[in-house]
From Swiss-Prot:
<keyword id="KW-1133">Transmembrane helix</keyword>
<keyword id="KW-0472">Membrane</keyword>
<keyword id="KW-1003">Cell membrane</keyword>
<comment type="similarity">
    <text>Belongs to the UPF0391 family.</text>
</comment>
<keyword id="KW-0812">Transmembrane</keyword>
<dbReference type="InterPro" id="IPR009760">
    <property type="entry name" value="DUF1328"/>
</dbReference>
<dbReference type="Pfam" id="PF07043">
    <property type="entry name" value="DUF1328"/>
</dbReference>
<protein>
    <recommendedName>
        <fullName>UPF0391 membrane protein Memar_0049</fullName>
    </recommendedName>
</protein>
<feature type="transmembrane region" description="Helical">
    <location>
        <begin position="5"/>
        <end position="25"/>
    </location>
</feature>
<feature type="transmembrane region" description="Helical">
    <location>
        <begin position="33"/>
        <end position="53"/>
    </location>
</feature>
<dbReference type="GO" id="GO:0005886">
    <property type="term" value="C:plasma membrane"/>
</dbReference>
Amino acid sequence: MLGGGLVGLAILFFVLALIFAILGARGVAGMSMSVAKWLVIIFIVLAIISLLL
């Protein structure tokens, strides 16, 4: 997988969103961007928590 873990999934969903946006599937692109955004937020929160512990 691309980078593994949450970052890899976020990158995957971001790329899917770009592809679907180019193809004109706005609903799928928006959903993919939403998933990618939440994965990045979760990754950042977990990274901060792991740095503090």
